[in-house]
Each structure stands twice: as C-alpha cells, then as structure tokens.
C-alpha cells in the first residue's frame, strides 16, 4: 500500500462512518425498547433481556459481519454495489429465462427499498426527539411538530447539495458512536452480569422458553440491523476496505457496548424500559444527548435520501423508470445529485407517515418487513453470482445459501405478523414502485417493437438516398436513433413531409452500458455509412448523465467536427393509442401513458438547446 493510500484510508474510513452507518447506527434509540415493551406478552425479565441481547449480538455477527461485510460486498460492478447492481451481475451468465426471474427479484428488492425509505427518516428523527419525554414530559405533544420541522429543513436543503454540511457528518457520527460506546461501557461496568448474553446459549434458551412468542419477537430483533443494505449500496462511494475497517473498529464495538449497556440498565431498573437509551445518560447529559441524537438521525435520514436518489438514477438509466430531471449539486462528486420530483414526493410521504403514526413505537410495527424481504433476495442473487460468475463449488454455494436463508426467512416470516399493524405501508409502497418499474420497461419495449415493425433496411434506404438524393439543404442534421440498424421515425417523416435532407446526416444512438462509468476513450464510436451519412454511438455508464455537447466534443477529437449551434436535432414525438387488450393490460397501458406524459423530454434529458430541436409527431398503437 502506498503512502497516499495509507493516508487516505483513515479519511475514507471516517467518511464511511458518517454516511454508510447512519441508519444502523441509530437503531439503539428504539430497538431494545421495542423488544421488551410488553407487546409479546412478557416484560423486562432476566431471561428475556439475555435472550434478546444474544439474538441481537449474533445477528450483527452473522448477518452484517459475515454475510454482508465478508461475502455480499465481494459482488461489485466496477466497485459499485446495490440491489440493482447485484441483479445485473447475477443475470450475466444465465439463460434468458433465468435472467428474467433474476430481474424480477432485483426489481422487487429495489421496490422494497422505496417502501422502507419512507419509514426510516420518520422513525429515526421521532425516536431522537422523543427524548423530550424524559427531559420535559410536558413537551411530549411537541414531538410530532418538531420532527416535521427538522425533516422539512432537511428536505429543503437537498437542492443546494450536502457538500458543505456533509463534511460535518463524519465527525458528528464518530462522536455519536463514541458516546454509544462510553454510555454502554459505563452501564456494563455497573452490572457486568449482562455479558453472559454473549453466549449463544441464551438465544437458544429464549426460543425454548418462550416458544411461539419468541418467533414473533424476531420482528423486533430485526430493528437492530435495519440499514444493513447501505453497506453494500454505498460501496462505490468509499470502497470495500474503508467500510470494513469502519465496521470492525468503530461501529460494531459501539453498537454491542450500547445494547449490552441498555440491557445492564434494565436488569437493575426495569422501569427504564420507557426509554432505555436516554436513561443510560446521566441527567446533566440529557439535553446534549438529545441534540447529538437528533443530528445523528438527520444524518441517517440524509444517507437514506441520497440512497433513493442514487437508486432512482440507476433505475432511470437502466430503463426501469421514466426520465426525470436530475440535478448535479457538486462539480467534483458525480454521486451528489438531487431529483426534485423524488425529493418532494418522499417529503410528503414522510410527513403523512409521522402525522398518521404519531410515535416511533407505532412506526416500529411497520418497520422491518421490507428490510428482511430484501435480505432474502440479496442472499439468492449473491449466491447466483458466486456460482455463475465466480464459479464457486456448487455444494459450497448451496450450503452457504441454505445458511443465509435459515436466518433470513425466519426474520422475514416473523415480520409478516406486522402487516396488519403497519407492515402494509412499505409493502403497498413497494408494490406501487414495482408496478411502475415493470410497466415502464415492458410498455417501452412494446412501443419500440411497434415502431421498428416497418421493416425498412437502414443500409438500403441510405443507398437509395445516395443514388437518387432529395433536395439537399446546408448544415448538419442529427437524428436520435434508439437502435443501430433501424431507420429513425423522424428521418422517415422528414423525408415524407418536407422532402429534403441536410448535407450531412448523423444518426446518434445513446446507450447505457452495464457498468457505472465508461472511459472517455470508449465514449464514442463513429462509423461513416456513406459520403453524407454517419453513425455515432455514445456509451455511458448508469452513474453518468448523457450530454450531447460532450458527445460532439469527443466526435471533434475523432475527426467528425460538429457545432451545437449549427446543428438541427430531429426527434420523433409519439402519440400513443391503446389498442385492443384485456382489461388489466389496458390499465397498464393507461399507466404508461400517464408516466410518458410526465417524463422529461429528450431535449432536456440530453441537454440539447431547445431552439435547435425539431420534433416530428407520429401516432403509434400499443
């Protein structure tokens, strides 16, 4: 390792603490309280405390440390992670039928994330503000308004980017984790008996003693690992090593100490179950703890918001969501983006959730079902990658998958009990997003197939135009072409109605590759089809935003000189008609029409000056 790398590792590790671990790092605010609140038919009993602590500890070890940190993070696409990346990797070396199944699993996982992302900011911030109940019980009616005010400020500043305040995230979260560790260790020293719960015997004993109820109680235990997907999703920002170092050196020890510290407190003072996290702190430290807890939960919420922006961009670029405005808030960091529509849709949803559920304990009933569902899908997809891409031994992969699912499926099944009490919310939101993504992808494919049914050969048409050319006009015309060997509709209609052709015609195709970035050397491919026709294929990764001006610059370097303000861009605008279909497909067609009407137009999507664009309409039945 070079000196530079040695210097950068601590900085990247600190940055990872500030972003990646915000969600899982604020789980101690509410996890143990929900486990022992009495909802499962038992209160703060010694065996229950030991059982829950043992389950939480071994879940952190097995699911986070072994499954995600050690195994899942091996599956990267040019350093990038996330459920859609895993879906893409899993489908590379499989049959078409198997790929379709894997795509559906990946989209379900992505949809689950959208469902859970509405709950995370609400439960995190509310659980911090609820410290007011300990400091000043008379202010408990202000918890909901203050939570909304805090989150409103967070969503408002999104359009300005988080580059400046983001520099504060890491030191604040480091202070947070150190406080977790200190408060927990202080309580453990006062009652070291609690360390017996490190023995997995207590987890087994918990199931044997409480039987069926213990299985349902797993729905509360899973709160301790919510946010685990962020470790994999944010891998591209910081790299594997900093995330792993941060987990084992700071985050895991701090979480374990704090959970066991809360357990030690509850063994001596069962009445502290009202809010064991804040009651760990001495009375004089309650107000500072409330402030730092609020800041930590805001940072956790910011990480989730940034995550949903990144997932949305990836889904748009891969063709699963309609084009929408994506604003880059940093000239230095391509990952810092702002999507206005998603931002305000998420804000309204979060406010509705806070007003409806009123307390973090009520929200806890809705939390976890989407997380555990994603965990099941991640296990299946990552095992597929291990077998098909890495060519690991079939028996070993099978045993590993069984081991993962033996944890994931019971956790998911236990959370199904939450559907009536609130779990319906993330499931409903996830179902909506899955419907939207599959509708856009399938109907877009149907539309393109119909548009390409005319069957005219591009080469034959170009040859015919060169032999018997129409009237030529000076300048360059660019026709946006979705497929390489298909005549663009705009070109057909321009010849049909205007009966003219520019002196130079460029057929431009912008395509998204199965990689986060494409090197500038491979950005454009130029092919001269005839003396006056050129084909340009510009490739972008799914983390990049296509820019026609940049394409022209690269073309100039390759010998094809183009000037934006001397070029006319011809695009087709499709007016869609829904043909004869079964009723359910008609509904899907109407949803697609709605999505298309609200999609970002191509000139805005590719940053083409509006005064250089000519749109030619065509009617297509789908």
Swiss-Prot record:
Responsible for the low-affinity transport of potassium into the cell. Likely operates as a K(+):H(+) symporter. GO terms for molecular function: potassium ion transmembrane transporter activity; symporter activity. It is a multi-pass membrane protein. It is found in: Cell inner membrane. The keyword Ion transport applies. The chain crosses the membrane at residues 9-29, 49-69, 101-121, 137-157, 163-183, 213-233, 247-267, 276-296, 337-357, 363-383, 395-415, 419-439. It catalyses: K(+)(in) + H(+)(in) = K(+)(out) + H(+)(out). Its main location: membrane. Belongs to the HAK/KUP transporter (TC 2.A.72) family. The keyword Cell membrane applies. Keywords: Cell inner membrane, Cell membrane, Ion transport, Membrane, Potassium, Potassium transport, Symport, Transmembrane, Transmembrane helix, Transport. This is Low affinity potassium transport system protein Kup. Pfam families: K_trans, K_trans_C. It comes from Klebsiella pneumoniae (strain 342). One of its GO terms (cellular component) is plasma membrane. PANTHER family: LOW AFFINITY POTASSIUM TRANSPORT SYSTEM PROTEIN KUP, OSMOTIC STRESS POTASSIUM TRANSPORTER.
